[in-house]
């Protein structure tokens, strides 16, 4: 099975700028509640992926998002892991 290359921080930031709502501070939990421009919370995508083991393309299909949006959410998660992990623990347990 081929491994996919993890994007660089600059590549992550480019996707985040394009696909993640830049006004995350308007959400109740701030950066932990950031959403894609389609309105899907990043924490929900990450929690769903953990629970299902879905790969990027399966996750994109399940949420009717492009793979690039999922990549942006994963990049945002890498940059804000402690906030999003806390949000997941509060919500999912």
Range-by-range predicted roles:
Residues 16-41:
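Short, Lys/Arg-enriched anionic-surface-contact patches
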Residues 38-54:
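Short, amphipathic alpha-helical "recognition" segments used to contact nucleic acids or chromatin
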Residues 1-13:
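General nucleic-acid-binding
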Residues 58-61:
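Short alpha-helical "recognition helix" segments of helix-turn-helix
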Residues 83-93:
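Short Lys/Arg-enriched helix C-cap and helix-to-coil transition segments
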Residues 68-79:
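Major-groove recognition helix of helix-turn-helix-like DNA-binding domains
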């Amino acid at each position: 099975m081929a491994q996919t290359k993890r994007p660089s921080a600059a590549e992550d930031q480019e996707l985040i700028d394009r696909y993640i709502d830049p006004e995350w501070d308007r959400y109740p939990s701030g950066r932990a509640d950031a959403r894609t421009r389609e309105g899907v919370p990043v924490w929900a995508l990450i929690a769903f992926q953990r629970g299902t083991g879905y790969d990027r393309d399966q996750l994109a299909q399940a949420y009717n998002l492009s793979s690039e949006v999922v990549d942006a959410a994963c990049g945002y998660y890498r940059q804000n892991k402690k906030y999003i992990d806390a949000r997941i623990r509060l919500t999912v347990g």
